[in-house]
Each structure stands twice: as C-alpha cells, then as structure tokens.
Amino acid sequence: MTLLTTEIRRARASDAAAIAAVHETSWIQAYTGILPHRALQAMVARRDVAWWTRAIRQSTRVLTLDIGGHVAGYATIGPNRVKSLPQGGEVYELYLSPQYQGLGFGRKLFLAARQDLRTGGRPGCLVWVLEENAAAIRFYENAGGRDVAEGSETFDGRTLNKIAYSFD
C-alpha cells in the first residue's frame, strides 16, 4: 500500500512547468464546448512555463496542491477586482488535473485559498464562474457560495455570461 501525502503551499518558480500542464489539461476539459476553439487554444498557449514563472516571481499569489510530491492543482488569489462589491479577496482561478477532480481535493484547495485571503487581511471572497460551466457552478454552490452579481466576457466574438459567487 502506498501512502500519498497532500500539501497546499505557495508556488515556487520550479513549479511553473507542472502548473502549466495542470492549466492546459484542466482548461481544455472545462472549457471545450463552452469557449470558442481558437480562443481556448490561444488562452492555453499564452499560459506557458515562462508565463507561470513570471507570475510566480512577481505579485501573483499562486497556491499549489501537491499530491505525493507532484503538483495536482493550483489556485490564484488576490484582491477583489470589482470595487462595487464588498468582498476583500477573490479566487481568480482554481483548477485540478482531471484525475484528481471529484475526490475532495478541490474543496481542500478552495478552503486553503480562502484562509490565505483572510490571513492576508482580505475577508470575504468572490469567485467568477462562466454560466455555462455547470460543474464549476455545482462546486461553488455546494461550497456555500451565494450568487451576488452577474457580468459577461467576450471570447473571440462570443459573449458569455458569468456569475459572481460570494463567500464569507
């Protein structure tokens, strides 16, 4: 029997390749059929190893979920970008490699991200979800999120609605 340890920690530059791989596989799984194909491919290609290295070294707060010493997921967090909403923090992204989804690891990473925001003086948090992403909506509603705002984003000429979920 093999015992795998899990750890959530701040990302290091040496994690960039693993995070880029998680980003690619999880985004393709999550957004194929939702985002226009070309837009999705361009967004994935833009987030290469060099991009993640810069993000980690600069001001972006990136947390990783390590399982058995390998990066299985990541979250990016920071200040709430919508000043008309009172929440102090925002989870910009939270993604896991597909083989780790549905096992409770996403919830663990999400709770750690929220705790990191609180500890950093950013109480309350927002998460924006595309309205067509049923799996993400189910995840955040099951985590206790309240639908507090709506917006839209345009990808390669296609406008998609998004929902903001609030967490205390």
Predicted regions, residues:
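Conserved beta-strand-loop-alpha-helix junction that forms the acyl-donor binding cleft
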Residues: V127-I137, T154-T159
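Conserved active-site tyrosine of GNAT-family acetyltransferases
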Residues: Y140, G145
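Terminal substrate-recognition subdomain of acyl/acetyltransferases
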Residues: T2, K162-D168
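Conserved hydrophobic beta-strand within the GNAT/NAT acetyltransferase core sheet
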Residues: V91-L94, C125-V129
